[in-house]
Design a protein with these regions (language model features):
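Core segments of cupin and vicinal oxygen chelate
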Residues: 43-92
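A short, acidic/glycine-rich surface segment
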Residues: 69-73, 100-106
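Short glycine-/small-residue motifs
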Residues: 92-95, 165
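Vicinal oxygen chelate
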Residues: 2-3, 7, 16, 23-32, 37-45, 84-88, 105-133, 151-156, ...
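Histidine- and/or cysteine-centered catalytic micro-motif in compact active-site loops
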Residues: 98-100, 122
Length: 212
């Protein structure tokens, strides 16, 4: 069975051979072997509830369900239900329900905003309509937040996974400007652990004047 793959939020710059460079001095990385993300899987509390929630609130259809009493890769006894949701454009979001395991939690040392899944929508109109619809269903929504390249809203699914809906709003020249400073920013961060200011325009609003 062929499963769908990635959803590219922005057409990020590439190096000469299509792979992201290993560093600023090495613009010819190894030939990429990965074609795309096959699927992303998370744990869920209740597979049926999760499938219905994603279909109701995000319009994501259930692609298939897989259930076993043992883990195919290890043979370990561990009954599970594995569901696959259609995330659009050939992308799949999957979940495991593990009824014999301790209740799921999260990494308490990592802030709740950090680990999240971003899903693209086609317009600001769609983004704002989604916020209204989610809020009317009693789901707390943050945003829209302006990231210059895109605007986003944030909320949590029934399992505590943070979700982002993003609408591309990047202007000509933005990606090229970011591409020029990416390694300088990373190397400065590695030394100082303080946010470099090369791309402060993304969140201070000055991009509106810089990129017409």
């Amino acid at each position: 069975m062929m499963m769908p793959g990635p959803y590219r939020l922005v057409n990020w710059p590439k190096c000469h051979h299509g792979a992201t460079a290993l560093n600023k001095d090495e613009e010819t990385a190894m030939t990429p072997i990965v074609k795309k993300i096959h699927h992303v899987a998370y744990r869920c509390k209740d597979a049926l509830e999760t499938a219905r929630w994603y279909e109701k609130h995000l319009g994501m259809k259930l692609v298939l369900s897989i259930a076993e009493d043992a883990v195919p890769s290890t043979g370990e006894p561990d009954p599970y239900m594995h569901i696959f949701m259609d995330a659009g454009m050939g992308n799949v979001l999957a979940f495991f329900e593990l009824p014999t395991r301790a209740p799921m939690g999260r990494d308490e040392n990592t802030p709740a905003w950090t680990q999240h899944l971003a899903l693209e929508v086609d317009s600001m109109e769609t983004l704002l309509a989604a916020k209204t619809r989610l809020a009317s269903a009693g789901i707390q929504v943050v945003g829209p937040t302006d990231h210059a390249l895109f605007q986003s809203i944030y909320f949590f699914d029934p399992n505590g996974h943070r979700l982002e809906l993003a609408c591309n709003t990047n202007r000509p020249g933005m990606l090229e400007a970011l591409d020029k400073v990416k390694w300088d920013m990373l190397e400065e961060w590695a030394q100082t652990k303080k946010a470099p200011k090369h791309a402060a325009w993304m969140h201070d609003g000055s991009y509106k004047e810089m990129f017409q």
